[in-house]
Regions:
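A structural signal for well-ordered alpha-helical segments within the folded catalytic domains
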Residues: 27-30, 118-122, 203, 226-230
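Short, well-ordered beta-to-alpha junction loops that form the rim of enzyme active sites
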Residues: 48-49, 140-144, 248
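GT-A fold catalytic core of metal-dependent nucleotide-sugar glycosyltransferases
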Residues: 112, 116-171
Length: 300
């Protein structure tokens, strides 16, 4: 395979700065993007009218990356209204949120968030269909690296990311895969596959979009909704022949792991952090359900 990689990303304003938890402002995201936006690869960016000017200022005017195409979407909800309404209905049923150990996570309660996370594959598929991207294409989250969480020197992104990926869909894992049922993964908020970077040849992005869309709708039909990480895991389990998995020791290490560029990084063990967090959440979850069960009148 050719080592050239086209990048696709997206940013839509979700009002995340007003959330009670997992709060990040629009300016936070623009700063995150600014950290890696000088990368020299061809880039297609999907966004809304309000954000387009700021993105252009960063990518094109500040870093002079004219190999950039900005696609404006007036209303992201209208991209796939059936999918949006399905996710909304499942998210709002009450049980979808209460079922989880940590109901404050955005995938537990925010249907716009879950919908937008799934549109990653749609954006790349759309880029291919419009003739804007070909060959190996990588989705990369707009907020990749969170402004210095892993990579510490922005100037080290002044390079073109190249790597000879095979003719498969490449997913990157932060925890070892097991056979835990999907419902338990949703309940325990476990993470296996990261959604921040996905790499695949152009010919497989339409198939991937159709598969993740179908799996989200299937999950919605049984009363649940979740973000793209769980949906990607479902898709992998059903279609292993399409995929190649790669272990990562951080949510953001992919570009460092699969390029010849030298980066200055912070070491972060995602696995240990997740395990410590889960113990605290499990205790809270047990207390909550013990209280609920104590108030249920049982009739024999």
């Amino acid at each position: 395979m050719n080592d050239k990689i086209t990048l696709v990303t997206a940013f839509f304003q979700l009002g995340r700065g007003e959330w009670n938890s997992f709060k990040r402002t629009n300016d936070d995201y623009f700063n995150y993007f600014d950290f890696w936006a000088r990368i020299k690869n061809d880039m297609i960016i999907y966004t809304d009218k309000v954000s387009a000017q700021k993105i252009e200022e960063i990518r094109i005017k500040k870093y002079n990356r004219k190999n950039t195409k900005i696609i404006i979407i007036d209303d992201y909800r209208k991209i796939d209204e059936d999918l949006y309404n399905s996710i909304k209905s499942a998210t709002e049923n009450g049980f979808n949120t209460e079922f989880r150990i940590n109901p404050s996570t955005p995938e537990s309660w925010n249907y716009d968030y879950n919908y937008l996370m799934l549109l990653k594959e749609w954006c790349v598929k759309d880029s291919v269909e419009k003739g804007l991207a070909k060959g190996i294409i990588a989705w990369i989250d707009f907020g990749y690296n969170h402004g210095g969480k892993y990579y510490t020197k922005s100037q080290e992104f002044d390079f073109e990311w190249k790597w000879k990926f095979s003719d498969k869909i490449h997913l990157f894992t932060v925890n070892k895969l097991d056979d835990l049922p999907i419902f338990e993964i949703i309940r325990s908020v476990n993470s296996y596959i990261q959604g921040g970077v996905i790499v695949a040849p152009d010919k497989l992005w339409l198939k991937l979009w159709n598969l993740v869309r179908e799996n989200m709708l299937t999950l919605n039909k049984v009363g649940f909704s979740d973000d793209d990480q769980t949906i990607l895991l479902m898709t992998y389990r059903q279609n292993k022949e399409l995929f190649e998995l790669h272990e990562s020791d951080s949510w953001f290490s992919v570009i460092a792991d699969y390029s010849n560029q030298k980066f200055t990084i912070k070491k972060c063990n995602a696995k240990k952090k997740k395990q410590k967090l889960s113990k605290k959440l499990i205790v809270k979850y047990l207390i909550k359900w013990f209280s609920i069960l104590n108030n249920i009148e049982i009739k024999w």
